[in-house]
């Protein structure tokens, strides 16, 4: 399980974002190796954004992140999208329109600017 966080550096979430970036990179490389070997094994990195799970109810940091409406997806929807993507042979999938838009932004602007934007979002939306 990867995450949208794997697409960017996030201050105060650096270990989480870095570990998810590893999962994205590893999954894409492994997917390519499996295809080249004609193994029949499919590897898909599922990169959801905010997902309604118990992790969101009880974050480890002891703080609660206020998520803008429309940004939270159900775990069921995320899982269904991931399963369909895997069977379709996609090596990476980002469920949700807002999340896809976020990945586009991360490729259009400098990493420095993206880090500032998402760092500011986290600082301003933590209770």
Which residues does each PLM region occupy?
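Conserved catalytic-site region of short-chain dehydrogenase/reductase
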Residues: 6-8
